[in-house]
């Protein structure tokens, strides 16, 4: 008879950790007022990604900084989303994300542009694996809201394959320009 492991059907995710990179975005000292005075602790905000199209964020609170970072990292790994990237380096189309008073606009960029984004958005794009993007944050500059708005926008991104599947067409039909065949649109006209 085969030996049964004692995990009770749970997966062991500890083996997957080396494939993810993480970035500490913010750390705050927080306090809780109790009967005897104030209890101080730390809150950490972490972005985790595989730099190949998956990203997530988490926040953790603890009495010590390393424990708060560990909790935030674990939460981020549980909340990862997959984002389709064009040529593995940029977004497929311009997108806008919102969360609370925060609004984020993200635009595709030609190769060599780099990541033009501020603060927490830069961490999200680096962990996602985006190499060329232009992003602007409007409204709330709170790092929690900026990250949530960025991820809201990234969830809305669709690849040509997804659009073609939804419309019941071929990818080549979706990539046509103004009624031209896809091959003619891809190649410049000879003069």
Swiss-Prot record:
Family from the record: Belongs to the universal ribosomal protein uS5 family.
What is its biological role?
Answer: With S4 and S12 plays an important role in translational accuracy. Located at the back of the 30S subunit body where it stabilizes the conformation of the head with respect to the body.
Self-association and partners:
Part of the 30S ribosomal subunit. Contacts proteins S4 and S8.
State where composition is biased (Low complexity): 182-191
Instruction: Please give the name of this protein.
Output: Small ribosomal subunit protein uS5
Identify the residues that the record assigns to the S5 DRBM domain, covering every copy: 20-83
**Which key words tag this protein in UniProt?**
Ribonucleoprotein, Ribosomal protein, RNA-binding, rRNA-binding
Sequence segments annotated as region (Disordered):
158-191
Q: Which Pfam families match?
A: Ribosomal_S5, Ribosomal_S5_C
Gene Ontology terms for molecular function: rRNA binding; structural constituent of ribosome
Q: Which residues form a coiled coil?
A: none
Q: What is known of its domains?
A: The N-terminal domain interacts with the head of the 30S subunit; the C-terminal domain interacts with the body and contacts protein S4. The interaction surface between S4 and S5 is involved in control of translational fidelity.
User: Cellular component terms, GO, for this chain's entry?
Assistant: small ribosomal subunit
Give the record's GO biological process terms.
translation
User: Where in the sequence does UniProt note compositional bias of the Basic and acidic residues kind?
Assistant: 170-180
PANTHER family from the xrefs? MITOCHONDRIAL RIBOSOMAL PROTEIN S5
